[in-house]
Each structure stands twice: as C-alpha cells, then as structure tokens.
Amino acid sequence: LLYAMEHADRILTGLQPSFNWRDMLTGIVAAVILKLLVWQKQSDAKKLRKGIEYGSARWGNAEDIKPYMSEDPWMNIPLTATEALTMESRPKQPKYARNKNIVVIGGSGSGKTRFFVKPSVMQMNCSMVITDPKGTLIEECGKMLAKGPPKKDKNGNIMKDKSGKVVHEPYVIKVLNTINFSKSLHYNPFAYIRSEKDILKLVTTIIVNTKGEGEKASEDFWVKAEKLLYTALIAFIWYEGDEEEKNLNTLLDLLNESETREEDETYQNPVDMMFQELEERDPQHFAVRQYKKYKMAAGKTAKSILISCGARLAPFDIAELREIMSYDEMELDKIGDRKTALFLIMSDTDTTFNFVIAMLQSQLFNLLCDKADDVYGGRLPVHAVSYTHLTLPT
C-alpha cells in the first residue's frame, strides 16, 4: 500500500481504458451499487430527526409571524404588542392566507374588551358589528369612529385639503339598544324582503331566535304549522300591504284577528275573508297557497297553532318594541358597501330582549353573504367584522 502511494503517478500512467464487455459490466455494477448505497443513506437521513426526538415545538419569533402580517400596520388585526394578522384575504403569497376567526376566552374583568376588542376597533380598517354588553364601547370609541381614519388616495397616501389639514373618512354609526329603547334606532326585518325566498328566510329567523311556550313548543308538527301561518301572513303583508304596514306589528294584528271556533267549522274571521278576496283575484298567489295549507287544520288544531304563535310572538307586543320595529333605520344591506359601526347594546344580566339582537345578526349575515355572492362576485367592497360576546355554558 505504501509502495502504491509513493508510485501512484507511475501506476496511473500505465492505466488504459478497456472496452472489454466484462470490464464494462463490472464498472456498471459497481456504479449501481454505489448509487444504491448513497440513495439508502439519503433515505435514512429523511426519516431521522436527530436531537429533536422529544419534539421540536418552540416559541415563535418576529420572523415566523412576519409573513402573516401586512406591511401596512393599519391593515392588521392586533393580537399582541408585536404580533398581528393581516386583514387581506388574498396576500401576495397564498400559502400565508389564514381565516380571520379569532376566539378570546376569559372571565369577567380579564381584559377581553380592553386588550383585544378596543385595539381592533381603533384600527378602523373595516365595517364592524359590535356586541356591547354594557353600552360602554360606544361611549369610549364613538367620537373616534365619528371622526374616522385618515382618507387615503389610490396610492395609499394620506389626503389633505387645501389648507394642509388631514381629510378624514367618518364612519356611519348605528345603534340597537335593547336596554333603553329610547336611545335606539329603528329595526324592521321586513325592510330586507325582496322575494319569496326572503320571506322564507325571515320566517326561519323568527322561529330560530324566539321560543314558544308549553309542551308543544318544540314538537316538529307545531313548528311547521306555525311556519305555514307566518309565511302566509308575511307574504300577504309584503305583497298587499301599504308601506307603513310592512312590519311585525301588522303581523301581530293579523294574528289577533285570526279567531277560530271549534264548534263552527264554517266560521270566517276577518283574516279568512281577506285571503278569500285575494284568492278570487289571484288563485295562485304565494300567500294564498300557504294559507290554504294552514287551513287544512281542523278548528281545535288551528286554535292550538294560533296559541303557539301568540306565545312565541308575545314579547313583540310591548309598546316600546312595537315602536322600534315600526320602520327601519339600520340599513343592514349597506354595511359591506361603506365603513359602518353597528353597536348592539344588550344587558349582561337580563336576556329578555336578546332575541331581537339574535334576529338582527341572523338577518345581517344572510344579507351580507347574499350580496357578496350576487352583486360583488364573492367579496364585499368593505370588509365586515363581527365582535360577538358569548357566555360559555357552565
């Protein structure tokens, strides 16, 4: 071996390439074996994670979160003092796109509002639907939103007037106050009906967000029967009523006039007469077809249906609530068109009127989704965010 190392130049000088088939076959086999050995070693290297056998979790750093943040700090959802999540649904690199659903869990006084909701509201980068259990958020953030963020041009530069002052873009502020109705704007669910499909959606919204009374309240038959009657009456109001009659108050009035007599199956109440007249004019009217299905019930059954309807809608008979729902000022369908802040003020100790807010939220989400899909091709011009306060079951 020592001789070979000392005289390597002489040995290599004498080597000549051989084209003998045995020599060539030996070389090919040797090359294949060498390649297999290299491949096996690389393969094993992929399976082994030396030094992290017990896990590789670690705390993230600024470089880890950076791809998920917008370069414009005002277009982020603040999570901590140094971490945030971009509001952009389509970032430059799609692999960093994330949904914007965030859950914050904490007890009373833990800072959910102070350290998450308020900083997010102060970004003023979208429309907001804010559940305000104590009515304090609108007092603390209202003036700021009324002034609005600085207006920017197409290039992202802050706009100024001729005198050099910054031009602001004020928010449209809406309030539904179920603690003090005298400080609330009006909300009329009928204002957002455009077709028969919307009537069915409204009926579902009413059923889901209110509750009946008694043993029959949760039985499928009675709920479906109630839906038939609500659908017929709401369709009649929307198609045949005057503009000032298109509200829940008229629905309650029609229910009050829908008397039935068990001993007299031929008795006609004022509502029966109205539908009979409508049927004579238009036998295929949507309201008529729904009402005829409801009228298949016998006198005793029809009376039970009316009692269920009356129990479900009883809270709407309160004078203050009737006034609130007489016409609409909310303009829910425009929240995705312009920067709007909708404050839903509710009591955190009394849930009596929470169903009103639940109805509004159900209708709002349906409206915005439909408008995004049908009008804007899937994306609203202004991003809309909901800050909802929920109590976890114990």
Identify the meaning behind each predicted range:
Residues 1-110, 114-117, 152-162, 349:
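Basic- and hydrophobic-enriched, low-structure N-terminal and domain-boundary segments
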Residues 98-390, 394:
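P-loop NTPase motor domains
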